[in-house]
Amino acid sequence: MRIFAMLLALFALPALARDAIKVVYHFDAGLEQATKGLRNIKNHLDVDPKAKIVVVAHAQGVNFLLDGAQNQSGNPYNIPVEELAAKGVEFRVCEITLKSNKIDPKKLIPEARLVPSGVVEVARLQAREQYVYIKP
């Protein structure tokens, strides 16, 4: 039995090493955090293009996903979001935040997908789907 366990571990480790790393980026602090976080994600994918990345936005973190949102230099956020989405990055927005701030979901850019709660989504991804957590 012990030899079987050792053989299983020996052959399972290379398979695990090939699996894509799953990462949840947590945005909740406004446009400056979004600028930094989007740059982090681009760099992340440059180094590890197989990474599975989900951005969860709530509170002030949803603002960069609103149609027409711009960074501090006046550059639109939708362009880097579109580029990252084309690489498989998912953008999830807290429905509670939208309701409490009276933001019409139609104001979100097309890449954004609603989830019932941003905080619950972050917890679910970590606990149930083994995502690692990054907060830029």
Regions picked out by a protein language model, each given a short descriptive name:
Residues 12-14:
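N-terminal signal peptide c-region/cleavage motif recognized by signal peptidases
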Residues 1-4:
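Positively charged n-region of N-terminal signal peptides that target proteins for export
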Residues 6-10:
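Hydrophobic helical h-region of N-terminal Sec-dependent signal peptides
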